[in-house]
Amino acid sequence: MRVLGLMSGTSADGVDAVLAEFSGSPSEPKWSLLNLVCTPYPEDLRQTVINAGQGITLNSREWLELSESITEVHAQAALACDPSAQAELVGSHGQTVWHRPPQKNHRGASWQILQAPLLAELLKRPVVHDFRAADLALGGQGAPLVPMADAALLGRVGGWRGVLNLGGIANLTLIPPRSGPDRRASVMGWDCGPANSLIDLAVEQISKGKLAFDHDGSIAASGHPHTTTIERWLKEAFFQLPPPKSTGREQFGLADLEQRLKELPKLSTANRVATLTAFSAAVVAQDLNNLRIRNLVRPLELIVAGGGSRNPVLMNELRQRCRGMRVLNSDELGLSAEAREGLAFALLAWWHCLQHPGNAPAITGAKRAAVLGVRADPA
């Protein structure tokens, strides 16, 4: 089956559309990536999405128009990726505007904004959406949902394999080896903390809105990270939590950035960006090191995808902090760094049609595995 996968992450830079074909066993599918198109959000829409994700109040009309605009850009991305309508099905994550993990006093909740019936009608094809709801209803975090797809798409090697997505948030998948005593272990996955979210916000502030991100890590490359501050930040409560855990821009957004910058008052602009960049690598390295210390997992390699994989300073920080582990870009395995999440949600939509579970209780904390997503058909 040919499926379109649509993904817009916490960086809110636009929609990644992937056209893929799947066949064979759901858990070990044969797949091919047929096309990838990245459609940016208009700047005013991007800013509204970021503001909404940081708790800035919108009125009812603004929420309505935001959901409509997001849906229209998703449709544009889908049509650009699949102009001849080869796909029989669309899997769309929607745009996360708020994510609340389960806490002692209330269940978890997550809101991905999208008008799925409108998207189905615009594309004249069924759309599977709202992928997180079933896991949340079962007491799970609702995130991350990509690890089971990672395991199915990338397969196993002779040792533990890590897959790291550096979007707005850094999320990690660990895939068990194909042989040896750990071969029957469960896939693991969780959110480590901020990846690009704080860096992007800082660069936007510094440039007075002229830059949306640190292109090629050029600002960070001209500075030096403040190691003592990073070590102090790593002791914060979230970074001490064991998996399962999930997070988003509501935790690592503008308010968090401003607090961190107050702790760096005497540093130059370049040193501040370098510190935030090194911090993003450090939160991942600390989680991996904690697993190693507990003799749970020691990955042979770490495959990196997402926008942060294009930042050579961030990638170098990862290599420095994850010694003994091969750190490589997913491009080296034939999977474009920009395609990974769109491909994953295309697979989750295909699994929905096959009634194949898409979550993993060991990863999200849900009571049981469940088929993910809700289907909206054209009118």
From Swiss-Prot:
Q: Which residues bind ATP?
A: G9, T10, S11, A12, D13, G14, V15, D16
Q: What class of enzyme is it?
A: transferase
* Pfam families associated with the record: AnmK
Q: Which UniProt keywords apply?
A: ATP-binding, Carbohydrate metabolism, Kinase, Nucleotide-binding, Transferase
Q: Which InterPro entries match?
A: Anhydro_N_Ac-Mur_kinase, ATPase_NBD
Tell me the Gene Ontology biological-process terms attached to this UniProt entry.
1,6-anhydro-N-acetyl-beta-muramic acid catabolic process; amino sugar metabolic process; peptidoglycan turnover
Which pathway does UniProt place it in? Amino-sugar metabolism; 1,6-anhydro-N-acetylmuramate degradation; Cell wall biogenesis; peptidoglycan recycling
What reaction gets catalysed by this protein?
1,6-anhydro-N-acetyl-beta-muramate + ATP + H2O = N-acetyl-D-muramate 6-phosphate + ADP + H(+)
Q: What is its EC number?
A: 2.7.1.170
What residue ranges are annotated as transmembrane? Answer: none
Q: What does this protein do?
A: Catalyzes the specific phosphorylation of 1,6-anhydro-N-acetylmuramic acid (anhMurNAc) with the simultaneous cleavage of the 1,6-anhydro ring, generating MurNAc-6-P. Is required for the utilization of anhMurNAc either imported from the medium or derived from its own cell wall murein, and thus plays a role in cell wall recycling.
Q: Which family does it belong to?
A: Belongs to the anhydro-N-acetylmuramic acid kinase family.
This one is known as Anhydro-N-acetylmuramic acid kinase
Task: Give the lineage.
Answer: Bacteria, Bacillati, Cyanobacteriota, Cyanophyceae, Synechococcales
Q: Gene behind this chain?
A: anmK
